[in-house]
């Protein structure tokens, strides 16, 4: 009986370790995604922060913030990105549903599109959420997005001075 209990606890510990490792190393952006965003960038990227503001959900809802550090200089090409699809969603109306890199701050019309995230109270409780708002108003920075509908969109904010990319995923919340 003690042997069975020990093996069970050992297996649960190993399984817990694997789940923890997968959670900590998960990144929604891969090298191909960075090539879409920054076509000439070949450097390394480190995920330095991630926050899931909803937690576990049975309804596939997302509200997540990721912060990446670009390890080499990035040049912004205002003709990119050219999204054809994003996270398995085909972009049908490219002019309305996606954007090339634009200089911050956002105009009133686009702020209205993303108001539920930009004005979200959960950002007040998170250091990087607060920084996101500050960086969004700095004229030296850039943003772009993929807008599926008011319940699903993906927002990118690039802090040029620090070489950091904020990535927000929002779906169904």
Annotate each PLM feature.
Residues 4-5, 31, 119:
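A sequence-composition feature that detects small, non-aromatic residues
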Residues 90-173:
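Extracytoplasmic electrostatic interaction patches
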Residues 10-11, 15, 29, 37, ...:
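Generic detector of leucine side chains in alpha-helical contexts
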Residues 10-14, 52, 126, 160:
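Generic detector of intrinsically disordered, low-complexity, polar/charged segments
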Residues 15-93:
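N-terminal export/targeting and maturation segments
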Residues 4-20:
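Hydrophobic membrane-insertion alpha-helices, especially the h-region
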Residues 6-10, 36, 48, 122:
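Exposed boundary/loop context
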